[in-house]
Amino acid sequence: MLKILINAYACSPNMGSEPGMAWNWVSNLAKYCEVHIITEGEFQDKIEDVVPKLEQGKNMHFYYN
């Protein structure tokens, strides 16, 4: 499986604009690839609430700055 590293300063499953766009990218890429995402710690709670509920969540690995 292809592995991808993404540095997304803002990434959040329940926001629009930059955080929402980054979430759209990583969640869709994770359907086909193993994705490692570096993002800000302020989004950690929101991300960790949603990722386990997603089928592709097993392919999404977050690292917080």
Kindly give the residue locations of the regions a language model identified.
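A short, charged, and often flexible helix/loop element on the N-terminal side
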Residues: 58-65
